[in-house]
């Protein structure tokens, strides 16, 4: 009798776990249908170089567009705790991960918004990081040309603004097929 009860409990637990996995996979896949690009994490090895290139100063406002899991926001917070940090993420799963990872940060210093970066006002940004596909980069350039604060510094990983010349290109000296090959720095 005890063995039957144990097997039934294990069976129910396996069913619950399988259902949870299916829900997470469906949630993830459906978020990809409505997002302009999938979530691709920034390689850990390049994060310090991104933070260095941003050169975030106290009191500045930093935007991470397509902030994914919040990795860049947390690195910037560790480097410059007196900056205001804003992450914008459209896809649900990375958004929730970023919210969870930044839950202990002061709300006046770090915020995660679930929104389209093209529909948010970006005019308060002093610094910005992007790791976005070319189609979205083209749309973002048009938006920034209209509303960027003079002096805005944008650091882009791998992808470029086709119609804007970077003020600096940093070769990250990564293996040929690895993500995170170059940082392009733009000034508006």
Predicted feature descriptions by range:
Residues 98:
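Conserved SAM-binding loop
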Residues 58-68:
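Conserved class I S-adenosyl-L-methionine
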């Amino acid at each position: 009798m005890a063995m039957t009860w144990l097997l039934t409990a294990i069976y129910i637990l396996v069913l619950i776990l399988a259902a949870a996995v299916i829900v997470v996979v469906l949630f993830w896949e459906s978020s990809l249908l409505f997002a302009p690009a999938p979530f691709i994490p920034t390689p850990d090895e390049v994060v310090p170089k991104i933070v260095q290139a941003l050169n975030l100063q106290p009191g500045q406002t930093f935007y991470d567009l397509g902030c994914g899991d919040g990795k860049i926001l947390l690195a910037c917070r560790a480097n410059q705790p007196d900056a205001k940090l804003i992450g914008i993420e459209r896809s649900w799963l990375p958004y929730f991960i970023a919210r969870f990872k930044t839950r202990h940060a002061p709300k006046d210093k770090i915020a995660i918004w679930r929104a389209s970066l093209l529909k948010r006002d970006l005019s308060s940004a002093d610094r910005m990081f992007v790791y976005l596909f070319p189609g979205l980069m083209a749309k973002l350039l048009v938006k920034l040309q209209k509303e960027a604060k003079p002096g805005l510094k944008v650091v882009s990983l791998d992808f470029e603004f086709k119609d804007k010349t970077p003020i600096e290109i940093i070769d990250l000296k990564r293996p040929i097929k690895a993500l995170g090959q170059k940082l392009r720095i733009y000034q508006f």
